[in-house]
Amino acid sequence: MEVKKDNLSSQAKLWNFIYGFAESLVLKCAVQLDLANIIHNSGTSMTLSELSSRLPSQPVNEDALYRVMRYLVHMKLFTKASIDGELRYGLAPPAKYLVKGWDKCMVGSILAITDKDFMAPWHYLKDGLSGESGTAFEKALGTNIWGYMAEHPEKNQLFNEAMANDSRLIMSALVKECGNIFNGITTLVDVGGGTGTAVRNIANAFPHIKCTVYDLPHVIADSPGYSEVHCVAGDMFKFIPKADAIMMKCILHDWDDKECIEILKRCKEAVPVKGGKVIIVDIVLNVQSEHPYTKMRLTLDLDMMLNTGGKERTEEEWKKLIHDAGYKGHKITQITAVQSVIEAYPY
């Protein structure tokens, strides 16, 4: 009997792996239908017919909607309850991150990560193990990720929205939990800072700091032009503007060790000998950890391998990388986010 139970459990686990993509794409469907916002804005739970009548595309196949909602309830994203003989749907706690208009909304990340083109490199995972040059992204889409973004403005916008989404999540935790890292800083450059969302959080929390976002021209072109943030276009491999501190959020994981050392050396040149530092916001892997984010961090490591040729790093790998770039020391602080904060001291 135990053997049968083990077989059933193992087969069920494998089937769930096989159809693992379904949860991502049903989640995408929920976002596209705006289900969380419709229920949130109603102020109460809703029947299927009420929900159906408010969907953006009409007419609606209510049987199909019922089946999608049944799956979303099973995912524990939505709730269902019988009230006065009617089945009504509400929001489970994770669904609040699908509600637009607050700083922790994750819709931008969902739409980018589940985009057909951005998922394509995963189909080339095996090819990435061949030892041949080129990333899975290049094999799937014919160019590297940076060239692709420059050539496809609509995808670049999707990507930038996801990065801005991620920045709001991370920076909220960073400012609240280790704002002291900005003590004594009057100027800061966010290298690879996208459209400026991350550094804007710093500018608002610490108005005395003059903040600059530094990124590639096609990225800066999409910046909304925040009054608190100065925008500069350029190439971090060639030059980094001078400041008391350099910040890089989710940048070094895009690159291999050799390129990271080059970037870190450019950062070292940009900060003053006295009090200068580099603030790295990136994942610190601990594969033995039972932390809820461990699987996510390992997934992102594969994602970097596929898309950029980069990697997520363990604490020991960060220590070696920073040392090899000629820095004198570093400090790692965990925050309530997927990433940690690494302060690197060049002098």
Curated annotation (Swiss-Prot):
It catalyses: norcoclaurine + S-adenosyl-L-methionine = coclaurine + S-adenosyl-L-homocysteine + H(+). GO terms for molecular function: (RS)-norcoclaurine 6-O-methyltransferase activity; O-methyltransferase activity; protein dimerization activity. It comes from the Eukaryota. Keywords: Methyltransferase, S-adenosyl-L-methionine, Transferase. Transmembrane segments: none annotated. Pathway: Alkaloid biosynthesis; (S)-reticuline biosynthesis; (S)-reticuline from (S)-norcoclaurine: step 1/4. SUPFAM superfamilies: S-adenosyl-L-methionine-dependent methyltransferases (SSF53335), Winged helix' DNA-binding domain (SSF46785). GO terms for biological process: methylation. S-adenosyl-L-methionine binds at residues 192, 215, 235-236, 249. The keyword S-adenosyl-L-methionine applies. Its EC number is 2.1.1.128. It is an enzyme of class 2 (transferase). PROSITE patterns: SAM_OMT_II. The active site is at residue 253. Homodimer. PANTHER family: O-METHYLTRANSFERASE (PTHR11746). Belongs to the class I-like SAM-binding methyltransferase superfamily. Cation-independent O-methyltransferase family. COMT subfamily. Catalyzes the transfer of the S-methyl group of S-adenosyl-L-methionine (AdoMet) to the 6-hydroxyl group of norcoclaurine to form coclaurine. This is (RS)-norcoclaurine 6-O-methyltransferase.
